Swiss-Prot record:
NodB homology domain sequence ranges: 124-314
Substrates-to-products reaction catalysed: [(1->4)-N-acetyl-beta-D-glucosaminyl](n) + n H2O = chitosan + n acetate
Enzyme Commission (EC) number: 3.5.1.41
Residue positions of covalent lipid attachment, annotated as GPI-anchor amidated serine: 387
Glycosylation, residue list: 61, 149, 279, 293, 352
SUPFAM superfamilies, per database record: Glycoside hydrolase/deacetylase (SSF88713)
Cellular component GO terms, alphabetical: extracellular region; fungal-type cell wall; plasma membrane; side of membrane
One annotated GO biological process: fungal-type cell wall biogenesis
Signal peptide boundaries: 1-18
Phylogenetic classification of the source organism: Eukaryota, Fungi, Dikarya, Basidiomycota, Agaricomycotina
Name the UniProt record assigns to this protein: Chitin deacetylase 3
Keyword Metal-binding belongs to the record: yes
Amino acid sequence: MYGHLSLSALSLFAVVAAAPFRESWLQPRDSPVSQLFRRTAPDPNSNDYMSYYPGPGSTPNVSTIPQAWLDKLATVNLPNVPVATPDGGRPTYPNNEDDGDSTICSFTDQCRVEDDLYSPPGEKIWALSFDDGPTDVSPALYDYLAQNNISSSATHFMIGGNVITSPQSVLVAVKAGGHLAVHTWSHPYMTTLTNEQVVGELGWTMQALSDLNGGRIPMYWRPPYGDVDNRVRAIAKEVFGLVTVLWDSDTNDWAITDEPGQYSVASVEAYFDTLVTGNRTQGLLLLEHELDNNTVEVFETEYPKAVGNGWTVKNVADAFNMEWYLNSGKGNNDVVTTMSVAGTLTTATPTNTSTYVASSTAASSASVTDSAGVSIASAASSEASSSWAIANRPSHFVIAIACGLALAAIMV
């Protein structure tokens, strides 16, 4: 009977047949299908770009935190460590609890845990990193890194508020191959924040960096002032899969001033010399900054000395033989596994116009474990850019028409 149908009739059949497919494709927001899609990153060139994030310069309001992040937090069995109180730059704990004991384990008191990254393995490996970017001097630093072919050998621990105010600088670092990591949203003493505030500081910075780096989710974070304890470590690791990165030597480049008797460019460089030009062979993970001209000058002076003395610079991930990102391998061009921050799959919504909605992990998602041993939710499919793939996916309407035409050719 089909042999007598005209081509136009078969095409019409294809159009009609396509309707149920399109209806099933347009799933409600809370359906498992929609939960599989990555959030669409806002355009950093658009006038409303910053409206998709909390305001810079202060801890994000808890009301801006996606519910999925809070739901994940609720599943974490946190250690019994109280919130610390700010006390002149050294957070203190109730009842004069010892912040250096194994229960609290604050790095302010030089306490570390096994999972912390502290000194890289291997001889004369310099795990190169810069905190506090992007800033006004970041372009000059990035130019120097590029000129010396070491852009991909540097980890940039970026402040979320700086990221959204200077997205073009971040894009320069990404294009050059720089490794992006988290330095919180507003650079607070993290142990003095509530659990929810810790989530906001970390999660929003991860989201802002991911949005500018093809959906790659940061895997590493460095606590401002080195202020971290076991409660904050647990939130970073169990909610977001973040690895805590500390340092084995503070260059004090951040403290350089013109005041007599204080740190100067010359004194910081003199200390730097003892690390990279002496007989030391143990790996280095230094505290350095892309903060101002002084910090950049120190690095540009010391880098040639280190190389001349046999040191090899690597970014933090490579120095510890680990992956760069939670959902990608090494580099900013590796394939991205479809997932989003805290294993959720969401759509961007301006935070100043409506509540940010983040879906929970879809039932059809697979549980995978990253190299740090953290279980994260990852969609079963892997696409280099799922948002691109979705936007360019042939519609069922088109597919149905094509099938109808093919059927017509066979039947005639």
